[in-house]
A protein has these predicted regions:
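Short alpha-helical hairpin
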Residues: 48, 127-133, 195-196, 282-288, ...
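Short, small-residue-biased leader/transition segments that mark boundaries at the very start
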Residues: 1-3, 7-14
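Short, flexible, glycine/charge-rich loop motifs used to bind or transfer phosphoryl groups or to couple energy/partner
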Residues: 2-4, 167-169, 185, 430-431
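Short, solvent-exposed coil/turn segments
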Residues: 7-9, 97, 131, 190, ...
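Hydrophobic alpha-helical and helix-loop surface patches within well-folded domains
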Residues: 104, 136-398, 533-538, 549-550, ...
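Generic beta-strand hydrophobic packing signal
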Residues: 12, 176, 441-443
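Non-catalytic accessory/interaction domains
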Residues: 48, 73-76, 81, 140, ...
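Acidic/His-enriched low-complexity segments
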Residues: 12-174, 200, 303-307, 320-325, ...
């Protein structure tokens, strides 16, 4: 828009009207930005203002439904690059030698949390496709990682083109630049024109696993989808922040499909979202997808697995209710209606209601506005399959959804569609055959259902048998989730789960299923500790004999994590010392760094030498600084570890949040559990300050790093004592603690 006419303010104020003129007014303010959200390092800085930190950089009404046009001028060292939401319009030298003044073009309408700039010693790469340019800025020094930039740019182009085709709306902003930063707090952040990404997920090791490649592709697709869902159309208030995250993750899963034609994407969707959602939804700290938000200062606490992972599962249900064509029409109308503006979930539902006879508001009330999930059981009675749901929280809720079961009785088998209605607790259907003896009931065989599919120890044997023999990858993924959830709900035993998984894992050839099973096996050992030697033996055999090299690498990483026996630790020490990995198990620098931390804790007499040696091996200056920050947390000297912990209670020492989280996790490593129980109370006491000074994911990362390795009664007592001492502790912070402490109960 044209510049506003400048109004001359009187030197003395006689009334409020003296300060305003008829028509548009302009206010000019001189201010000094606070440092909190400038993320300063020695050679670069960047803004990160989501959800309510713009006010720490410049005076503003800091809420998402007040959008503005931004212009920016930066003065920086002449050796630095700068990038912002708008394109550079002019670069001038200043009167101060060695400094430049860089001016940027005015932006489209943006919410304050999307305002962004980055400045520093950065390398720039430029890529073009069909008349569109993308710049990638980074600080990487490894030529093999820098060589990945063309592939990164290609995936950005692919995601932009996919969304343009689906939405029918050309990319709604002037440019799309990528900045890849070391130590960045999140996977990515969707600032228009200046999208930030973490180097940990963008620059992959020389031999990345399928999981790592899919993760990068999904991240790029997620942040790119935000350009339409979050930036172009923004939530009115942060209680609806999930409405941008649900679309970003749901569409990310679809955008990556053509990039990986050999991947089972139905299985990948299940694997990506359902386990992560259950990890919070099963706990006493569960929250609804849409949460009440009293004040924007608490907006960061709305974020979590429920809005990132449960919501795309629910969105997929909604798409099935509407049908693909109706869904696409509704989404296009939604984007057109609220272009460059703000919307609510209720507004979207009103639009989608035009395309279906279903009562979407009633459906949404249960799935979106209520926390938790149904407990679902199944049995065969009088020749019928009987499926029942109940609300474990006693509210009498009924979750409408379509499920698919399979009943196997001897040589007879039948697949049965199950419809749980919003007004019914049960479903019954006559089997097409006469049951003879015990039947195996396989729940949720296509993975499209959501809930706790409860089984007994006796019933689990049938599921394990099918898991070992079936060739249906989606069925196997769903069974793995069901079995693990029953382990966590303590309806089946850790010993039985561990034994069955050790028998199953070496024979699984599908990489997605292998990674799921490996993760679940590691969790079982972490939460229900037992003699590690049987697990070590199976894992090392996979490391040395498995025909799939990425399976060897993934097994090695779990082996490193759980190794306890003298034989295993010595084997790892020799491997680290000689830098000689097993055949077809290529280890990266980050693998050796992780190994050095683990060895320093297992071998206290060699710890100082291990750390010094590993530090000398690291060449990249950013990674060297990270190692110097984290390595004191694995010191063999308790007084040094106590000093590290005390330092983390000071906000300034937590500024690089991934480093702080890693240090806290090492302080609370299972090998230090007895001594680190003393850290629990003060770290929990610090949670309000951690939230106030940290970014949106940091409170969860903080408490996860603190508690995840603890399994003792003493640790549980510390958590209980904390809540007893703080009966009025803020609900949203309490939920974060309860979600990460659930394994203690």
């Amino acid at each position: 828009p044209p510049p506003h006419p400048k109004h001359s303010f009187p030197t003395r104020r006689s009334s409020d009207l003296d300060w305003v003129a008829v028509g548009e007014n302009r206010v000019a303010i001189t201010f000094t930005p606070a440092d909190q959200s400038l993320n300063r390092r020695d050679e670069f800085l960047y803004t990160l203002l989501v959800p309510d930190r713009a006010r720490t950089v410049f005076p503003c009404f800091d809420q998402p439904d007040m959008k503005s046009f931004f212009t920016l001028t930066l003065e920086v060292p002449s050796t630095w690059q700068a990038v912002a939401n708008g394109a550079i319009t002019q670069t001038d030298s200043t009167s101060v030698s060695g400094r430049n003044r860089i001016s940027f073009k005015e932006t489209e309408p943006l919410s304050t949390y999307l305002f962004s700039f980055v400045a520093g010693k950065l390398t720039r790469e430029v890529y073009s496709r069909n008349g569109r340019d993308i710049s990638i800025y980074h600080r990487e020094t490894d030529p093999k990682k820098i060589a990945q930039c063309p592939a990164i740019a290609d995936e950005v182009f692919d995601a932009l083109e996919w969304q343009e085709d689906f939405t029918g709306i050309p990319y709604p902003f002037a440019k799309y630049d990528v900045i890849i930063l070391p130590g960045f707090q999140y996977g990515g952040m969707e600032h228009t024109g200046a999208t930030l990404y973490t180097d940990r997920r963008m620059f992959l090791d020389e031999h990345p696993t399928l999981n790592e490649r899919l993760s990068r592709s999904s991240l790029i697709a997620h942040e790119t989808s935000h350009m339409w869902f979050g930036d172009y159309v923004t939530m009115k208030w942060f209680d609806d922040v999930w409405t941008k995250e649900v679309f970003a993750n749901y569409f990310a899963s679809r955008i990556v499909e053509p990039l990986y034609p050999d991947v089972n994407h139905r299985l990948n969707f299940i694997r990506d979202y359902i386990p992560a959602s259950y990890s919070e939804d099963r706990t006493s700290g569960a929250n609804p997808i849409k949460q009440d938000l009293d004040n924007l200062r608490n907006a960061g606490l709305v974020y979590g697995n429920i809005i990132y992972d449960k919501s795309p599962v629910i969105m997929e249900m909604l798409v099935r209710v509407l049908g693909e064509d109706a869904f696409q029409q509704g989404i296009r109308e939604y984007l057109t209606t609220y272009a460059y503006g703000n919307a609510t979930w209720e507004g979207l539902i009103r639009i989608l209601n035009k395309y279906t006879e279903e009562d979407l508001a009633a459906w949404s009330e249960v799935w979106v506005n209520q926390k938790g999930m149904p407990e679902i059981t199944a049995s065969v009675k009088d020749g019928e399959l009987v499926v029942e749901q109940r609300d474990p929280l006693g509210r009498g809720l009924k979750w409408p959804q379509e499920l698919t079961y399979r009943v196997i009785c001897g040589t007879d088998s039948e697949e049965i569609p199950v419809s749980l209605e919003g007004n019914s607790d049960s479903f019954r259907m006559k089997l097409s055959f006469l049951p003879n003896g015990n039947c195996v009931i396989l729940p949720n065989i296509n993975g499209r259902g959501y809930g706790f599919f409860k089984i007994t120890e006796g019933e689990s044997s049938g599921l394990w048998s099918v898991l070992r023999s079936s060739e249906d990858e989606v069925l196997k993924g769903s069974l793995l989730i069901t079995l693990y959830e029953n382990l966590r709900w303590k309806t089946i035993s850790p010993q039985g789960f561990r034994e069955e998984m050790l028998a199953y894992l070496p024979n699984e050839s599908n990489s997605l299923l292998f990674s799921m099973a490996l993760s679940y096996l590691g969790d079982c050992q972490r939460i229900f500790p037992s003699d590690s030697r049987p697990l070590e033996q199976v894992l090392w055999k996979i490391v040395t004999t498995n025909p799939v090299s990425q399976h060897r690498l993934q097994a090695f990483r779990l082996y490193r994590s759980i190794a306890d026996s003298e034989e295993a630790v010595q084997r790892l020490y020799t491997l680290w010392q000689e830098r000689k990995a097993p055949k077809d198990c290529t280890l990266s620098e980050s693998d050796y760094i992780g190994l050095s931390y683990m060895l320093a804790m297992h071998l206290p007499e060699k710890a100082d030498k291990i750390i010094a040696t590993q530090l000398s091996r690291i060449q990249n200056p950013d990674r060297k600084k990270e190692y110097q920050f984290i390595s004191p947390s694995v010191s063999p000297r308790k007084e040094e570890r106590d000093s590290v912990f005390a330092s983390l209670l000071i906000a300034g020492n937590r500024r690089v949040e991934p480093w702080a989280s890693s240090a806290l996790a090492h302080l609370n490593h299972r090998l230090r559990e007895q001594e680190s129980v003393a850290y629990i109370r003060p770290a929990l006491e610090a949670m309000p300050e951690v939230q106030r000074t940290g970014d949106i994911f940091f409170p969860t990362a903080w408490v996860r790093s603190l508690l995840s390795a603890h399994t003792s009664k003493e640790a549980r007592k510390e958590v209980d004592a904390f809540f007893t001492a703080h009966p009025d502790f803020p609900l949203m912070l309490s939920n974060k603690i309860k979600q990460q402490a659930s394994h203690l109960y």
